[in-house]
C-alpha cells in the first residue's frame, strides 16, 4: 500500500525525521509531532555499503565499496596464507568500487569461476588484482587441478602500483578474458639496489589472457637503483608451474574491434 512521507526538522531531537503524514499532528508553530507510524533519522553519508554473501561456495558482492584487501580462495589453493573467504568456487562481483589502503584489492587462488563487472579498482599498493596459485619458489605440477575461468567486463584498473604487476599480477593456472574497460596510470616501481620493477599495467607469468578493446594508458615501469621491464603488459616465460611435463608460460592475445589510442606506456 502506498504511503506519503514528509521530511521535517525536530527541535527536540535536533535532527531531520521522516514522518508518516497519515499519523502526525501539527503544533501551533507548524512543527510536526509524531504520534505513531514510520519514523527514521536521516543519517549523513547515505546508505551503508553492500555486504558480500557466501553460500555453498558461491561468493556474491553487488555494489561493493571496500577499502581493505580481500582474499578469496578455493579449497585447492596452492598458497599457504589464510584468506578472508575460504572454499569459494564461484565469485560474482558487480558495480564495485575498491580503494584499498594497503595490499591488493582482490586476491584469488585455486580453481574458481570469477566474474567482475562494471567495477573500478584503484590505489592498491600490491597490484589491484592478484591471481596466484603458486607455492613460492617451489615447482607446482598443475595436471591435478582445473583452470580458473576469469572474466572482467568493463572494469577500470587505475593508479595502482607494485614492484611486480601494478594493475594485474597473474601466476596460476587460469584463463582470463578482459572485455572493454581500461588499465590507466598503474606503476611497477622499485627503489632497491639491483632490484627489478616489472609490469606496469600487468604481469602474466602463466595462464592465458585475452584482451578485447581494452585501453592501456600511462602505465609505467620504473627502477631507480635497478632495472625495469614492461610498461604495459609483461609476459614472463620463466615459471615453476608445469603442465603435461612442460612449463606453463604466459599466453596473451589482443583483439581490437574499434578505434583506440594507446599512449604513455613507458619503461
For every predicted segment, state its role.
Residues 1-6:
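Short acidic, Pro/Gly- and aromatic-enriched capping/linker segments at domain boundaries
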Residues 52-102, 106-126, 131-161, 169-193, ...:
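Surface-exposed loop/turn motifs in large extracellular/passenger domains
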